[in-house]
């Protein structure tokens, strides 16, 4: 169910030149126009409330969030491995096991800063007066990788096991907030890590910059290292490949969290726009995937021909009884429509009787209507909404299947409209088509507004039921109203109106195409 209005044909405005809507007569412009071909839309092109969202697929917004969370988990493990592989050099600095070799380069240049760096891990942190400690930067990035790993694992697990919590708007709001916080923190941790593992980046412009460059210059100039290379000093001055990979993965994690936020917002919008009965969280197998048994089918056909179906006139009488419902569900009088516009051809008895069913009748049970248009239900329905915060599918009795027109296809409708509205041959005929278009458009809009009011009310009640506590008075009242509107929406009157709207749309599209063809012929 959609809260947005049904799709409407564009208004007829001959004073505006819009090639994708209407091509006005060439006489209005006094010049030559180049108009794109205008194609008529099919009668049943798109109705939002008939759209089904398959959220169980990996290509849907929730499925993309699952994929991104899985990628974040893998990248967090890779960041942890890359950063942890370089911790050994920092541990050696802190213990001062190479104190003899370290004191020579540092003692000569920085003897007055920190006592000659007896312990290198602490010397540059305190003796330099505020440089970023590589161990602190690496610890910060490791901590953020751990937090991101835990958060992404929770998101992935709750989505894969299809828990009730992961099917609510509140869940995706939490995902948005957590992803935003973690993305910002990972960005800060990555910047700090870059400063920690690259001493020349933080030394530029400081009072100790020249000393840092002097120490590390031997590793930046080719052939200047000599025979002896201090491995610990080398890893301090040069960014290791593992550290570079960790930096790249840090920015990739930020991008992944940004995409998670985008798809979480899209999921919330779709959940606000569509009813829960239009969202499939689990893949449902309606038909059994079994090879056809021709022998059994012949037996069923021969055995089933003994029973006579109800007369076709009874079927037509049940369908052709339109009544106008208001938004509150009360009957406000009858409204007659032309029988030729929405009347369905009678159901062929042989076809209806000879088709074998592989499922039980209860799986396709629909509300029944008597000849006097009163709704008959097998039993009194209880509220079909679940607990607040849980996304529970509506009772299958309430599912609405699209109202069909029997054997009348779009091509047959087009032939009918072509007989009623043949190609235009004169300007007077064009003006007549314009008046018919305007009158039909007004009726189309008013009827769609009446149907859309029921859809909006259902969507509002659907959101309210998620906020109420089950078994409360507000919940029961809202559930009763929700079920009543679902019955109204499943009634034959609502479906006949909906079918009439679709055929009106086909009529308006045909008129628009005829006018467009006439205008193109005149150019």
UniProtKB/Swiss-Prot annotation:
Keyword Transcription carried by entry: no
Lineage: Eukaryota, Metazoa, Chordata, Craniata, Vertebrata
Biological role stated in the UniProt entry: May play a role in the formation and regulation of the tight junction (TJ) paracellular permeability barrier. May be involved in the organization of actin in endothelial cells.
InterPro entries: ELL/occludin (IPR031176), Marvel (IPR008253), Occludin (IPR002958), Occludin_ELL (IPR010844)
Coiled-coil stretches noted in the UniProt entry, renumbered to this chain: 433-489
Cysteine disulfide partners in this protein: 216-237
Domain MARVEL: 60-269
Record protein name field: Occludin
Domain OCEL: 415-523
């Amino acid at each position: 169910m959609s809260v947005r209005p049904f799709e409407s044909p564009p208004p007829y405005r001959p004073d505006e030149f819009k090639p994708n809507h209407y091509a006005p007569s060439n006489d209005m412009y006094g010049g030559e126009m180049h108009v794109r071909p205008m194609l008529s839309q099919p009668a049943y092109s798109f109705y939002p409330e008939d759209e089904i969202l398959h959220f169980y697929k990996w290509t849907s917004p929730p499925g993309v969030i699952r994929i991104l969370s899985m990628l974040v988990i893998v990248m967090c493990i890779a960041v942890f491995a890359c950063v942890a592989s370089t911790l050994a050099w920092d541990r050696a600095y802190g213990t001062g096991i190479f104190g003899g070799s370290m004191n020579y380069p540092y003692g000569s240049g920085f003897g007055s800063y920190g006592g000659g760096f007896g312990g290198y891990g602490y010397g540059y942190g305190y003796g330099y007066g505020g440089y970023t400690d590589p161990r602190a930067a690496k610890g910060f990035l490791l901590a953020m990788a751990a937090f991101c790993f835990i958060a992404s694992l929770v998101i992935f697990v709750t989505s894969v096991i299809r828990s009730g919590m992961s099917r609510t708007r509140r869940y995706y709001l939490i995902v948005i907030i957590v992803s935003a916080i973690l993305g910002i923190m990972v960005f800060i941790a990555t910047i700090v890590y870059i400063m920690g593992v690259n001493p020349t980046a933080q030394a530029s412009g400081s009072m100790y910059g020249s000393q840092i460059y002097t120490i590390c210059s031997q590793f930046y100039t080719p052939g200047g290292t000599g025979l002896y290379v201090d491995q610990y000093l080398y890893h301090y001055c040069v960014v290791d490949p593992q550290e570079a990979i960790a930096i790249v993965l840090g920015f990739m994690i930020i991008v992944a969290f940004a995409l998670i936020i985008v798809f979480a917002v899209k999921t919330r919008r779709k959940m606000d726009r569509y009813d829960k009965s239009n969202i499939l969280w689990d893949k449902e197998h309606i038909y059994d995937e079994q090879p056809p048994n021709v022998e059994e089918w012949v037996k069923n056909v021969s055995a089933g021909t003994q029973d006579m179906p109800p007369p076709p006139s009874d079927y037509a009488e049940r369908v052709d009884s339109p009544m106008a419902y208001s938004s509150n569900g009360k009957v406000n009088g009858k409204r007659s429509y032309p029988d030729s516009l929405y009347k369905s051809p009678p159901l062929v008895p042989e076809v209806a009787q000879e088709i074998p069913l592989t499922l039980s009748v209860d799986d396709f049970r629909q509300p029944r209507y008597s000849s006097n248009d009163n709704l008959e239900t097998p039993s009194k329905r209880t509220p079909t909404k679940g607990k607040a915060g849980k996304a529970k599918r509506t009772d299958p009795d309430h599912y609405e299947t699209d109202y069909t027109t029997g054997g009348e296809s779009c091509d047959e409708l087009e032939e009918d409209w072509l007989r009623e509205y043949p190609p235009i041959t004169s300007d007077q005929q064009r003006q007549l088509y314009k008046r018919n278009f305007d009158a039909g458009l007004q009726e189309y809009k008013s009827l769609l507004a009446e149907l859309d009011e029921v859809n909006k009310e259902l969507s509002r009640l659907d959101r309210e039921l998620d906020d109420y506590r089950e078994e409360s008075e507000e919940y029961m009242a809202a559930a009763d109203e929700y079920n009543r509107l679902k019955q109204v929406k499943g009634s034959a009157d609502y479906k006949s109106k909906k079918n009439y709207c679709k055929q009106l749309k086909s009529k308006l599209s045909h008129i628009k195409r005829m006018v467009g063809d006439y205008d193109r012929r005149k150019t």
